[in-house]
């Protein structure tokens, strides 16, 4: 006795009040989500203004994180661990490092996708006035490649997961898709509880008792922000946590029925450029838009401050998030580097990546990226050092020092606090980078650094001369 949802059945009985009637309840079969029917779209084309200057030469998803990963590895690994093997990556600004990393990691001898694929869809211009414009927003980026989803090889894709390239979290996307199917949703937003202090940075939602989104506000301020407060005990938070996090924030992770997404972009809202501020608020009245509450660790690291804090939080003894998990590992480019060599160093609460050389130095509450060189007397504290893309030999280093030049890495007796050191930076001897005056914002590109929210950022390939004080 199998029935389908939405089909009514009736039972005819006799008029005899004393006769007992036995009815077998028909069995409702739950439709299982199949990853073969799902495609993922990772948005990697943003200008990255909030993460500037880290994005001055590279796209946001290619920014290093955790010592040896790139931000793109997070949604890519989540897709692989969720068995989603049809992945599109949309790129635009500074895309060369991102394209190179994806090719090294996920093509060729990297991760195997079986009958799936990873396709990089770079922003292009086409004939006609409209075709001469670059991506104008998240929705416009997907619209420009809508023909890809109408292609014959993608005809069986029923649901499309849209992902961002600047978040830190571990998630099974198929649980999200299963929730989407169970509720017969047209659109599902993955949401997380948000604290008062950061709520205005996100799109906020209000939901009814069935989880349907009834109101959506993109980054509201003032009275509009207060109006979006909800009782988050209704989504499973304890009274204490609900008091701290009285908002429900959209994570920027969406699931669309494929036909609904195509209809929204082509016919309903052909001039709308952004999912969060335009498409989704407009779709609430006409479509079944559901919220999926994600209660594990999630961090939007789209600003320098949040990127810095989330990165250094990884160094804690018991971090809220860690890249290591034997069941759901995070993948990155295989670099075939030797183990790190550490001579007579003091290291506390730190992450030291592959292929580093540390000599008689101190590292505390810091991340040291691959191929880093820390010389004698170096003190590194509250710092994320991204490392280098290549080695300099001992003879090359000696030759540079003899010529009064600065090799890649950190020279003798240099003190560094609260800093992000971008790739291939050259920091000399007896340098002090401590921001003694507590400057919050400064632009010194000609001197090789910026300051954002009190955090010093040493630029990629910058040279900081011996004895410099910042």
UniProtKB/Swiss-Prot annotation:
One of its GO terms (biological process) is glycogen biosynthetic process. Disulfide bonds: none annotated. It catalyses: alpha-D-glucose 1-phosphate + ATP + H(+) = ADP-alpha-D-glucose + diphosphate. Keywords: Allosteric enzyme, Amyloplast, ATP-binding, Chloroplast, Nucleotide-binding, Nucleotidyltransferase, Plastid, Starch biosynthesis, Transferase. It is found in: Plastid, Chloroplast; Plastid, Amyloplast. InterPro entries: ADP-Glc_PPase, ADP_Glu_pyroP_CS, NTP_transferase_dom, Nucleotide-diphossugar_trans, Trimer_LpxA-like_sf. Activated by 3'phosphoglycerate, inhibited by orthophosphate. Allosteric regulation. Its EC number is 2.7.7.27. SUPFAM superfamilies: Nucleotide-diphospho-sugar transferases, Trimeric LpxA-like enzymes. GO terms for molecular function: ATP binding; glucose-1-phosphate adenylyltransferase activity. Its main location: plastid. This protein plays a role in synthesis of starch. It catalyzes the synthesis of the activated glycosyl donor, ADP-glucose from Glc-1-P and ATP. This is Glucose-1-phosphate adenylyltransferase large subunit 1. The gene is AGPS1.
């Amino acid at each position: 006795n199998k029935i389908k949802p939405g089909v009514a059945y009736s039972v005819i009985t006799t008029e005899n009040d004393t006769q007992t009637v036995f009815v077998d309840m028909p069995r409702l079969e739950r439709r299982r989500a199949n990853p073969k029917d799902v495609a993922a779209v990772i948005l990697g084309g943003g200008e990255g203004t909030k993460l500037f200057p880290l994005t001055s030469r590279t796209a946001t998803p290619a920014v290093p994180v955790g010592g040896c990963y790139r931000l793109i590895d997070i949604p890519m690994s989540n897709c692989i661990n969720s068995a989603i093997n049809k992945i599109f990556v949309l790129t635009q600004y500074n895309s060369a490092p991102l394209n190179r990393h994806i090719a090294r990691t996920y093509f060729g001898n990297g991760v195997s996708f079986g009958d799936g694929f990873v396709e990089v869809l770079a922003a292009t211009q086409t004939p006609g006035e409209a075709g001469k414009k670059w991506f104008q927003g998240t929705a416009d980026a997907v619209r420009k490649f809508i023909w890809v989803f109408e292609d014959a090889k993608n005809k069986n894709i029923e649901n499309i997961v849209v992902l961002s390239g600047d978040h830190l979290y571990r998630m099974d996307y198929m649980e999200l898709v299963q929730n989407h199917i169970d509720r017969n949703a047209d659109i599902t937003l993955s949401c997380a509880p948000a604290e008062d202090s950061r709520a205005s940075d996100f799109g906020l939602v209000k939901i009814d008792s069935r989880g349907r989104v009834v109101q959506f506000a993109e980054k509201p301020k003032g009275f509009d922000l207060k109006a979006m407060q909800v009782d988050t005990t209704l989504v499973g938070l304890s009274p204490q946590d609900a008091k701290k996090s009285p908002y429900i924030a959209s994570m920027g992770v969406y699931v669309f029925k494929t036909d609904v997404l195509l209809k929204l972009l082509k016919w309903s809202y052909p001039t709308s450029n952004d999912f969060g501020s335009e498409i989704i608020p407009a779709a609430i009245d006409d479509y079944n838009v559901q919220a999926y509450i994600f209660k594990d660790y999630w961090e939007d690291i789209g600003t320098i401050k949040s990127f810095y804090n989330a990165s250094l939080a990884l160094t804690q003894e018991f971090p809220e998030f860690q890249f290591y998990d034997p069941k759901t590992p995070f993948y990155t480019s295989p670099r075939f580097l030797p183990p790190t060599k550490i001579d007579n160093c003091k290291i506390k609460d730190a992450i030291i990546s592959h292929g580093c050389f540390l000599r008689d130095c101190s590292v505390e509450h810091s991340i040291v990226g691959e191929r880093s060189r820390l010389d004698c007397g170096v003190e590194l504290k509250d710092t994320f050092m991204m490392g280098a893309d290549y080695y300099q030999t001992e003879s090359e280093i000696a030759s540079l020092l003899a010529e009064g030049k600065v090799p890649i890495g950190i020279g003798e007796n240099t003190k560094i606090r609260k800093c992000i050191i971008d790739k291939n930076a050259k920091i000399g001897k007896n340098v002090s980078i401590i921001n003694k005056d507590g400057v919050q914002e400064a632009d010194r590109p000609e001197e090789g650094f910026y300051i954002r929210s009190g955090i010093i950022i040493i630029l990629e390939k910058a040279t900081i001369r011996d004895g410099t004080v910042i």
